[in-house]
Amino acid sequence: MSTQITTGKARFSYCNLFTPRAVQEGATPKYSVTLLIPKSDKATMQKIKAAMDEAKQKFMASNSGKKLPTNLKSTLHDGDGERPNGGEFGEECKGCYVITVSSNNKPVLVHADKTPLTDPQELYSGCYGRAIINFYVYDTQGNKGISAGLNGIMKLYDGEPLGGGVVTDSDWDDGWEDEDNDDLLG
């Protein structure tokens, strides 16, 4: 049994896969992505449950049989429910399980044919792919929970961008000429 799994197809949201980002001021910047896993993907959910159970067992074994902390926070949430900090998840999360995964190290990024993915424009919030993630239990500084680290991302195909969208070179080809627009107000 392993704490590492490869997901089935998921939609990516909040992609920070080329440049690490700190979630709050003073925090360590991390590479991260939120995975939107369809509730219909029973196979991935079975793998997640088994990996979470294994992470709990490993925590107890590596801590001399220490009991599992009670009231563990989880990185896995129901997209049809409420966010952990209150309020509803966005429309894109409906019908999905939502899991945010991160890493201090840059994850392996590949195309469906396993060639390296090097263009940041190709991995955006809204595209689809698979992820290799590794579950672990944490109990530090009063925070207790089960989370998952991000090891790799495989982009499968494009999807409708979430949020601000994707800008391409052709978006600038609108015929605008600078020489006649020196004074736009006057």
Question: Whereabouts are the PLM-identified features?
Answer:
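Compact mixed alphabeta submodule
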Residues: 115-186
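A structural detector for beta-sheet-dominated domains
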Residues: 36-38, 102, 151
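OB-fold ssDNA-binding interfaces and closely related basic DNA-contact patches used
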Residues: 1-98
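Residues in flexible loops and secondary-structure boundaries
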Residues: 20, 43-45, 107-109, 156-164
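Structured, beta-strand-rich domain cores
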Residues: 61-143
